[in-house]
Amino acid sequence: MSVLLLRFAAPLQAWGSSSKFDIRTTEREPTKSGVIGMIASALGIQRNAENADDELKKLNEMRFGVRVEKEGKLIKDFHMVRKIENRKMTASYITDRYYLSDAVFLVAIESDDTELLKKIESALQRPVYPLFLGRRSCPPTLPACRYYPHFPADRLRRVTAAQ
């Protein structure tokens, strides 16, 4: 087994799993789908590409875990958007968007495919598309990646986010 460790820190993060329409919630820690989305962005996988399903399937097969380094604070943002057509306002949309403020997480991605983990590490250091921690308004602070071949899972308890 090989493990790639990712440190997620930012002023704001949002990890939605069931948000719809007017209320955009966030989970209290990163979701696997959110992390896979960020990795797919780094790798340059386009949703409508022919091989996108195969690439995403490979990413989904990886094992995933999160350690909370700093919980952060749940905050709510009142958000209003106005739609304008032909120089006239036609509608206003009001939503509540929830974020985690100043949270820090250590995310572990485990796979038997060491080449895939190396490819992900390289892509996260030089992403094809911008990286976000859940939403576009949540860019990470200098994402740190570390690749650990044959990393025993019990050692994860001793790894600090600062390493």
Name each region found by the language model.
Residues 7-9, 65-67, 108-110:
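Residue-level recognition of well-ordered beta-strand positions that form the cores
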Residues 1, 57-61, 100:
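A generic structural signal for short, non-catalytic loop/turn and secondary-structure boundary residues
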Residues 1, 7, 50-52, 64, ...:
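Residue-level detector of functional hotspots within protein domains
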Residues 4, 62-64, 103-105:
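Generic beta-strand structural signal
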